[in-house]
Amino acid sequence: MMRRVTSSLPSALKLGRSLGPNVRFSGGAAAVEASPAIPPNSSSGKTLVRNMKPRELMQELDNYIIGQTEAKKAVAVALRNRWRRHQVDAAIREEISPKNILMIGPTGVGKTEIARRLAKLVDAPFIKVEATKFTEVGFHGRDVESIIEDLYKASLTQTKQNIMRRHEETARQKAENRILKALAGVSDGFREHLRSGALDDIEVIVELQEKKEKPKNSGTNEGVFISLEIPSSIGGQRPQTVKKVMKIKDAIPAVLQEELDKIVDTEDVSAEALRACEEDGIVVIDEIDKIVTASGGYKGHQASAEGVQQDLLPLVEGTTVSTKGNVQIKTDKILFICSGAFHSVKPSDMLAELQGRLPIRVELKPLTKEDFHRIITEPRYNLIKQHVMMMKTEGVDLVFTDDALWEIASIAAHINSTVQNIGARRLITITEKVVEEVSFDGPDRKGETFVIDAAYVRNSVESMMKKVDIKKFIL
């Protein structure tokens, strides 16, 4: 239903304009208080790693990841070297290849988190894959060349977003003009009211291109779909359009997106995406130790594991991969970051050729009691702050004393050292147990202050600690 407002549209009437036939009112009235018609560019506040110095990138990662200075430094330098390579002469640029990285460390110390945070910062095509998802060519499953195809898809998406970001202001102007033309037949006078949101609840008839859903393959990525539909642009035909009655606040995003799509269609997206993929692409391969077999060990259960390593060799060294769309992608300038816990195998158990293609080796250290305390206090949106803010939604003021935080860190370190070391993930288990009662009773404790101290922490995890102690005596 349309929102009725007692005031009419004074600004438009004072201008002496007559609204066109494509406009509908709710009782001749319009909204006078609303959010801006077109949202500001949401990407404008994003700091891109391409323009960041290694120290600045380190500081950004420090907001989320505690310790592991060597790993963060290696990644920061590797990314800065991508920028440096673009600044040198073209003759030497072709000779400079990225120095691939191998991150080694127990589970839960920050390997995956470093990759995840990089994905949010980096202004380059980026994908993260699990090594266990791939099989040797000839076995059932995905082969490693699909990594490069996925990277190219990520590059296409990012390139389109970058083009849209560059031309967003132009598209915004065109979208406003289309709405104003449908609204009043003119684009003078009403633009400020449109931007202020004063016209948001007016219904207007807009003409949008009709979008047809493409048939999807069922279940698998195999096979090729051949479309027999003839594009409407052939033979000079205009794309099919459909008229829709929409509120202005709903029409503007749709029209803006259509204008952006038109701009993207005129740009050479494929060529720019291919260049970005080949020159700036970053691939993170996690759990690489899971495709490594101990020297002299039984290999029957991992028949294709060594084959996956063999298939990775040409990708990491540099080859040309042909995608399903017949796009030729060179991989010699793509940066590969591999990581693994290496609990049951050693890095030296990897194929010697693959070891040689990962020249920068970084060891992440196990977490100590002090590290655990820093993890739940220093990061911008640490685990404790998350629980506090969640309980605030129930009207409960949740307070952790300093000795409670140290107790949580101490228990996490103790359980990791006596049972199995799962790193920082242990903190999630403990804190969830600690806040279990207040989370359950939260709706009934509105307006209360709930204080958690060291004694409360010990009582909450007492049953967990007893199970840990018993396990030490069970063979």
From Swiss-Prot:
Instruction: Give the transit peptide range.
Output: 1-27
Gene Ontology cellular component?
Answer: cytoplasm; HslUV protease complex; kinetoplast; mitochondrial nucleoid
Record's family?
A: Belongs to the ClpX chaperone family. HslU subfamily.
Q: Name one Pfam family in it.
A: AAA
Quaternary state and partners of this protein? A double ring-shaped homohexamer of HslV is capped on each side by a ring-shaped HslU homohexamer. The assembly of the HslU/HslV complex (HslVU) is dependent on binding of ATP.
Where would one find the signal peptide in this protein? none
Q: Report the coiled-coil segments.
A: none
Record-annotated residues binding ATP? I66, G108, V109, G110, K111, T112, E113, D286, E353, R425
Name of the molecule in the record = ATP-dependent protease ATPase subunit HslU1
Keyword Mitochondrion in annotation: yes
Q: What does this protein do?
A: ATPase subunit of a proteasome-like degradation complex; this subunit has chaperone activity. The binding of ATP and its subsequent hydrolysis by HslU are essential for unfolding of protein substrates subsequently hydrolyzed by HslV. HslU recognizes the N-terminal part of its protein substrates and unfolds these before they are guided to HslV for hydrolysis. The HslVU protease complex functions in mitochondrial DNA replication by regulating DNA helicase PIF2 protein levels.
Q: Any idea which UniProt keywords this protein has?
A: ATP-binding, Chaperone, Kinetoplast, Mitochondrion, Nucleotide-binding, Transit peptide
The record's annotation in InterPro entries points to: AAA+_ATPase, ATP-dep_Clp_protease_ClpX, ATPase_AAA_core, Clp_ATPase_C, HslU, P-loop_NTPase
Question: Where in the cell is the protein located?
Answer: Mitochondrion matrix, Kinetoplast
Gene3D superfamilies, alphabetized: 1.10.8.60, P-loop containing nucleotide triphosphate hydrolases
Q: Which SUPFAM superfamilies match?
A: P-loop containing nucleoside triphosphate hydrolases
